[in-house]
Amino acid sequence: MRGLTLLSLAFLGVCSALTVPHSLVHPRDLEIRHGGIEGRITNGNLASEGQVPYIVGVSLNSNGNWWWCGGSIIGHTWVLTAAHCTAGADEASLYYGAVNYNEPAFRHTVSSENFIRYPHYVGLDHDLALIKTPHVDFYSLVNKIELPSLDDRYNSYENNWVQAAGWGAIYDGSNVVEDLRVVDLKVISVAECQAYYGTDTASENTICVETPDGKATCQGDSGGPLVTKEGDKLIGITSFVSAYGCQVGGPAGFTRVTKYLEWIKEETGIYY
């Protein structure tokens, strides 16, 4: 089994400091370098206005320390994101209808009392959380993404083409203008992901994609959506990448949404 290292938010120099092969990290926890491509979906394409109406930028705060994640609108009052994004946060500001995250259509701020993490979340497993929001009306720039149906809960999505989206890096005390990017990726088998990261990390609760030509999710994309190209269903939540960097070719890992459809239904009443 491959080694596993889980890094803290304050960790720096991740690519040079690790010696364990095929370690991984939450994208939230990678070092941020201003001015480089590390802060966004790597080697993706700029999103057009209204192309990804279901994504929200999520700016989280803990005692004045800020970090950036993504999330997906699944209902008028619900956003789905990664549990590791909400860990330790006192509040979250949600940016709706934005291509440039400094220019959202509107914004809501909610306290941590509105966070519902999956009860068995630990480290890398069960990495999902709900955020209860004020009511949001849908239109061309702001809309929900549908979950897979309960009948589709056993679909592996292996070899399906999917799309990830995100803005990228959190910022260190400065307002860096970032534009929303998208990238098309292909789902690989759980066995392929386990061969790279080990079975403790890439469990049946994980869905992985290959990252050819440096195309991948990266820091700041945590919690963002992975959506099927055919049918537009939310099947993954950005969770982890190789700790050696986003462009080294290691699989990118997402929380497998179909494993949690019943829990989401119980908490929100949303199901298909």
UniProtKB/Swiss-Prot annotation:
PROSITE patterns: TRYPSIN_DOM, TRYPSIN_HIS, TRYPSIN_SER. CDD domains: Tryp_SPc. Disulfide bonds join C69-C85, C193-C208, C218-C246. GO terms for biological process: innate immune response; proteolysis. Residues 18-40 form a propeptide. SUPFAM superfamilies: Trypsin-like serine proteases. The keyword Hydrolase applies. Its EC number is 3.4.21.-. Residues 41-269 form the Peptidase S1 domain. GO terms for cellular component: extracellular space. The active site is at H84, D127, S222. SMART domains: Tryp_SPc (SM00020). Residues 1-17 form the signal peptide. It is an enzyme of class 3 (hydrolase). Keywords: Disulfide bond, Hydrolase, Protease, Serine protease, Signal, Zymogen. InterPro entries: Peptidase_S1, Peptidase_S1_PA, Peptidase_S1_PA_chymotrypsin, Peptidase_S1A, Trypsin_dom, TRYPSIN_HIS, TRYPSIN_SER. GO terms for molecular function: endopeptidase activity; serine hydrolase activity; serine-type endopeptidase activity. Belongs to the peptidase S1 family. Its major function may be to aid in digestion. This is Serine protease 3.
